[in-house]
Amino acid sequence: DVKKSESLMRVNHMGEVCAQGLYRGQAAFTKNTKVKEKLYSICEEEKTHLSMCNSRLNELNGKRTIFNPVWYLASFTLGVIAARNEKSWQLGFIEETERQVKIHLDESINMLPEKDYKSKKILKKIAVDEEKHRKTAKDIGSKKLPDSIRNSMDILSKIMKKITYHV
C-alpha cells in the first residue's frame, strides 16, 4: 500500500513540476498583462501544491522521478508556445490543462489505498484549486483548443504518468 501511495504521489509531484514550467513559460512570454498576472498567481498556488506533494513524498520515504528536469523543460517550452499563440488559444491551453489535471486527480484519489487519508486529503485540496484555475481561464476568455491539440496533450500526459509511476 505504501509503495502504491508513493508511486501515485510521485506522479502528482511531477504534475506540479510540470505546472510550474507550463505557467512560468506562458507568463514569461505573454504580452497580455492581465493574463501574466493571473499566470503568476496560479504559479504561487501550484508552488504550494508542489510543496504539499513533496512533503507527502518525504513522509512516504518516496523518491521523485529522475525525469523532473526533462518534464519541466518540456512544459516550459509548451508554455512559451502557448504564449506565442495568445490570440488564438493561450487561455484555452490553460483551461484544457486544468480540465485534464482534474480528471487525473480524481483518478489518483480513487486509486490510492483506502487508508491513505493523508494523500487523498492533499489531492482533494489540489483538485479544488485546479478547478478554480480552469474556471479562471474560462472566465477571462479562453477558447476551446482544437481536438488534435487536446488529444495530443492527453496522450503525452499518459506517457509521462506511466514513466513517472515507475521511475
Task: Name each region found by the language model.
Residues D1-V167:
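Non-heme di-metal
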